[in-house]
Amino acid sequence: MNQTELQQHMEEVSLQFFQKEFRHQAVFNTRLRTTGGRYLLKSHNIEMNPKYLENFGLEYFFGIMKHELCHYHLHLEKKGYQHRDKDFRELLKKVDAPRFCAAIPREITMHEYTCKSCGKSFLRQRRFNVNRYRCGSCGGRLKQTGSKKVYTESP
């Protein structure tokens, strides 16, 4: 999906679920990390995170669009548009939009080190110089035995 398709989908979702036009810009923002989308109060534009489209699919992405459009339409109507407001929660239920997003799994490289004396192994996220450090249990020399990718749930 590109920017023009995003704009078109945003306008269609707005008309279908809210019966109101979306008159501002919808753009992808790849710098968003922990949120699915963002409604900008000053410009009334909506920024969407393309990673949610890649990881969770189009149906989930439309849910995020509906959530951001709830902020958009309530703000323009001068009603409560924040997450804690009653108007916002009621509109979310009416259009069946999620209140919060699921976290995108992150890929982390874990480095494995093993003691040459006692054989104890441990994982670290950061690499370190094995010549400068020793085993905490026995004081033996360390060697890097490998690295592996781990996926985490939290951002």
Curated annotation (Swiss-Prot):
Signal peptide: none annotated. Its cofactor is Zn(2+). The active site is at residue 68. It holds the Pfam family SprT-like. Binds 1 zinc ion. The keyword Cytoplasm applies. One of its GO terms (cellular component) is cytoplasm. InterPro entries: SprT-like_domain, SprT_Zn_ribbon, Uncharacterised_SprT-like. One of its GO terms (biological process) is response to stress. The keyword Cytoplasm applies. Residues 7-145 form the SprT-like domain. Zn(2+) binds at residues 67, 71. GO terms for molecular function: zinc ion binding. Keywords: Cytoplasm, Metal-binding, Zinc. It is found in: Cytoplasm. Belongs to the SprT family. This is Protein SprT-like. It comes from Listeria innocua serovar 6a (strain ATCC BAA-680 / CLIP 11262).
